[in-house]
Design a protein with these regions (language model features):
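Iron-sulfur cluster-binding cysteine motifs and their immediate structural context
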Residues: 1, 13, 20-45, 212
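Short, charged low-complexity linear segments at domain edges
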Residues: 1-10, 123, 140-141
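Short, intrinsically disordered, charge-biased short linear motifs at domain edges
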Residues: 6-16, 151-153
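Residue-level signal for mature regions of secreted extracellular proteins and peptides
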Residues: 12-18, 22, 159, 261
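Iron-sulfur cluster-binding electron-transfer modules in prokaryotic oxidoreductases
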Residues: 35-282
């Protein structure tokens, strides 16, 4: 498709859409082909050259508009509880989307503030946290726990009020223009904070988002205005497990009488996208 510069077909769109971006192909490929960038390019090309069925276009546009906006997504999630009893009246794709909505939306949420200061002692580091879009609504306790843990270890946490989505959702939908708008906004906002007040890292606690942030430098490698800024943001980005292991060197008492048994999910985008394998298992 790309070599012949022909419009994408229904069959090609089906295969491209089926890719989950787990990136295991990048790990297993003996030649080291970067399929992540190939599939991203393919998605953009499909979006530009293939006319999808009407309902498909409607659904993708709904996802593109709603999910990156936490307030809109929260409203939709709350509304879904009222709509579910009447889901049989809607097309299949709407019914499927309604079934994915949680029955209960968590009441916890981050305070409306930009800086979360350390609890006690001297500040040892200052980081920005990507709180995300969908996660902020569905699982806000993840961000809350991340901030508590970092504050407890004397790390000041900054949450930029103008940053919601990392941009990967529209990026994976092939909506390049919308994705790049998010990318540019995030880069400019974080870079300004980095220059004015200093940032030692940009923390991601969602592996898919972190993979995209670390790719900003590549995405804007040919943009003379954003190239250096994007590269700096990618360099600063660390998954929370990386930061805890490499920067804080947590002193965990393994000889404590109280024993803990936990399960850890080593996400595919973490292993294959970010090449983070050992933290926090070692």
């Amino acid at each position: 498709m790309l070599e012949n510069k022909k419009p994408a077909t229904k069959e090609i769109a089906k295969h491209i859409d089926s890719c989950l971006s787990c990136y295991s192909c990048m790990t297993t490929c003996p030649s080291g082909v970067n399929y992540m960038h190939l599939i991203d390019h393919g998605r953009n090309y499909v979006e530009e050259t293939y006319k999808r069925p009407f309902l498909d276009r409607v659904f993708r546009n709904i996802l593109s508009f709603v999910l990156p906006r936490p307030k809109v997504f929260l409203l939709m999630a709350l509304s879904s509880k009222l709509i579910k009893p009447f889901s049989f009246l809607f097309p299949k794709f709407i019914r499927n989307a309604l079934n994915l909505m949680p029955d209960k939306i968590p009441g916890k949420k981050l305070k409306d503030q930009k800086v979360y200061e350390v609890n006690k002692g001297k500040k040892v580091s200052r980081v920005a946290l990507l709180t995300g879009c969908v996660q902020r609504v569905i699982s806000p306790e993840i961000n809350e726990a991340t901030i508590r843990l970092l504050n407890r270890h004397n790390v000041e946490v900054v949450v930029m009020p103008d940053i919601n989505c990392c941009g990967s959702l529209n990026h994976h939908l092939g909506k390049q223009k919308l994705a790049h708008e998010s990318f540019k906004n995030n880069i400019e906002s974080w870079h300004e904070e980095y220059l004015k007040n200093g940032l030692d890292a940009i923390i991601s606690n969602t592996s898919g988002c972190g993979t995209t942030l670390k790719d900003y430098g590549h995405i804007f490698k040919n943009d003379k205005d954003l190239k250096k800024k994007a590269q700096k943001i990618s360099e600063l980005t660390k998954d929370i497990t990386e930061y805890l292991d490499e920067n804080l060197k947590l002193n965990i008492n393994l000889n404590s009488e109280k024993k803990y048994r936990i399960a850890y999910h080593s996400a595919c985008s973490m292993q294959h996208g970010q090449k983070v394998h050992d933290q926090p298992k070692d």
